[in-house]
Swiss-Prot record:
May help in the organization of the PsaE and PsaF subunits. The gene is psaJ. The keyword Transmembrane applies. Keywords: Chloroplast, Membrane, Photosynthesis, Photosystem I, Plastid, Thylakoid, Transmembrane, Transmembrane helix. This is Photosystem I reaction center subunit IX.
Length: 44
């Protein structure tokens, strides 16, 4: 039961950090390349 409580307290924190960093990354990409359908650093 203690392991379940530890999991339930760690999972929301990790998911919040992950989704927050992912949202920040997407915001920064859209700030430098607004409305880009193709990104310059992906074209070879």
């Amino acid at each position: 039961m203690r392991n379940l409580k530890t999991y339930l307290s760690v999972a929301p924190v990790l998911s919040t950090l992950w989704f927050g960093s992912l949202a920040g990354l997407l915001i920064e990409i859209n700030r430098f390349f607004p409305d880009a359908l193709t990104f310059p650093f992906f074209s070879f």
